[in-house]
Design a protein with these regions (language model features):
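Short hydrophobic alpha-helices and adjacent helix-cap/hinge residues
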Residues: 2-14, 18-19, 23-136
Length: 136
């Protein structure tokens, strides 16, 4: 069941990227979409989320270094590092951010209202004040 959720996250990311990636076949690095990944801490479940995200993107045709450039940052279980990383992703003008774990998602949401943010490993997004409601 958890694997399905992880793969679903990757597929959602691929769909989000497909709206941002043009039809150009040119492989200039300036055409690459920047994806930031902020992970709170190294942990098997969180690592699996990141792996599922990358696998889902690759399955949808988005390989790191080709159409996209993934910048992975681990906050080493320091919330202040999450904030610093989030600020850096805003400065870098990432096109999409994957936030893994609640503090990472909260830091990213506090820093940007313009960058699409995918969250995973968040038990209750509404309780974490990431969304107004968990209902559609």
């Amino acid at each position: 069941m958890r694997l399905k959720k992880v793969m679903a996250t990757g597929l959602v990311a691929a769909l989000a990227l497909s709206t941002m990636v043009g039809c150009s076949s040119k492989k200039d690095s300036s055409d690459q979409k920047k994806i930031g990944v902020v992970q709170l801490v190294e942990h098997d479940a969180l690592d699996a989320s990141y792996k599922g995200f990358k696998d889902g993107l690759e399955k949808a045709g988005y390989k790191d270094g080709d159409k996209i450039k993934i910048e992975y940052k681990n906050a080493q279980n320091e919330q202040s590092n999450c904030q610093t990383i989030a600020k850096q992703f805003v400065t870098d003008k990432c096109d999409l951010v994957l936030a893994i774990a609640t503090p990472a998602a909260q830091a990213m949401a506090n820093e940007s209202k313009d960058i699409p943010i995918l969250v995973t490993a968040v038990t209750d997004p509404a309780d974490a004040k990431l969304v107004q409601s968990n209902k559609k």
